[in-house]
Amino acid sequence: SIYKRPEDGIVLVDQGRCRGYQECVRGCPYKKVFFNPMTSTSEKCIACFPKVETGLQPQCFANCIGKIRMAGFINTPENARADNPLDYLVHIKKIALPLYPQFGLEPNVYYIPPIHVPTSFTRQMFGPGVDAAVKTYREMASANDMDLMGLLGLFGSTDRMMTKWKR
């Protein structure tokens, strides 16, 4: 009833299979599916997949006032490319982490953990790699890490998905 598209990892609700019993709402570990009483269906964000299919970022990414979201495609760790922005943040610098890795769902959304939140909370949300991620993020200026600072500066700079960047 809830499925992940293999081509881009977007998770959708199959309206033909997920009826008005609200089991899809209860089944979502991230609590992102809601029941719409007007249509008697379970619904969730569709990640603007029609835009993604044309190479554009989802609307919430493009309109993010904090410019903290970047959409794109990520490779497996063994195929990570340093010129792919998301590979660089997730696999090379390891500052972008999945939310609730203990669920074992292999999410396609990664976050740079907040630095002004209690460590006990961020460890619960992001797992054991969070301490190193926060340390790398905090020290990037003093370490003069121009690649990382430059890449983070690209967040929100375009409405298109970035698949490559030149260091």
Question: Could you say what each language-model-derived stretch is?
Answer:
Residues S1-R17, E23-S40, L56-A80, L97, ...:
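Iron-sulfur cluster-binding cysteine motifs and their immediate structural context
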Residues E43-I46:
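Membrane-embedded catalytic interface detector for glycan/lipid assembly enzymes
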Residues G66-R167:
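Long, compositionally biased charged/polar accessory segments in the mid-to-C-terminal portions
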